[in-house]
């Protein structure tokens, strides 16, 4: 039985990249980006009798990362994106989650100390600059050390490219079904 996030993070390690073909769409409350559709809904796709909860757990993380990749791709059409992505929040506490994100984005993922508190750290940094305790926002960078950088594992690329293609097609193929079930046809 799972006792907390630490156990969930460890369980992801037991499933190969691509979650044995299971794909999760994280649109549990509709979606706004990269497409706007309040009727879009979450789903697990390609579940079989052999599918276990560990595949489902990993597919949820992969699905969230696929959605981030899709947004990142769209953003890249309008503005230059950085070579590395800074990952913050509670999700950044899981090493496997960070590696999955790096693999799916095909970018380095940088995690700072206490990533779950980075919002408060950022607010404190702004106050410190405003009060003159720190000279500039550039100086703040020195105060927030990078803990780890995760590099994409090219061995996982084929599985993730396959699942990402399916992920995007799931929306295209189900857009009308979402409207029928959840909104206006």
What does each model-identified segment do?
Residues 45, 105-112, 145-156:
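Short beta-alpha connecting loops at secondary-structure transitions
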Residues 19-111:
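Activation-segment/catalytic-loop signature of the eukaryotic protein kinase fold
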Residues 1-9:
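Single conserved hydrophobic/aromatic residue that forms the stacking wall/gate
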Residues 10, 18, 73, 77, ...:
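N-terminally biased helix-coil "hinge/interface" segments that flank
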Residues 3, 131-185:
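Acidic, glycine/GT-rich loop-and beta-edge segments that sit at the periphery of enzyme/chaperone cores
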Residues 58, 62, 99-102, 114-143:
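Glycine-rich phosphate-binding/hydrolytic loop that grips phosphoryl groups
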């Amino acid at each position: 039985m799972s006792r907390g996030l630490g156990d969930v993070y460890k369980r992801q390690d037991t499933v190969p990249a691509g979650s044995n073909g299971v794909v999760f769409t994280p649109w549990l409350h509709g979606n706004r980006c990269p497409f706007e559709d309040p009727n879009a809904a979450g789903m697990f796709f390609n579940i079989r009798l052999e599918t276990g909860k560990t595949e489902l757990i990993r597919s949820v993380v992969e699905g969230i990362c696929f959605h981030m990749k899709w947004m990142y791709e769209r953003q890249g059409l309008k503005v230059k994106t950085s070579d590395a992505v800074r990952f913050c929040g509670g999700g950044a506490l899981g090493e496997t989650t960070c590696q999955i994100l790096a693999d799916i984005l095909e970018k380095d993922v940088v995690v700072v100390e206490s990533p779950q508190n980075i919002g408060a750290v950022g607010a404190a940094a702004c106050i410190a600059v405003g009060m003159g305790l720190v000279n500039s926002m550039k100086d703040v960078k020195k105060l927030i050390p990078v803990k780890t950088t995760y590099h994409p594992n090219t061995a996982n690329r084929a599985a993730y490219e396959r699942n990402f293609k399916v992920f995007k097609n799931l929306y295209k193929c189900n857009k009308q079904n979402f409207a029928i079930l959840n909104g206006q046809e």
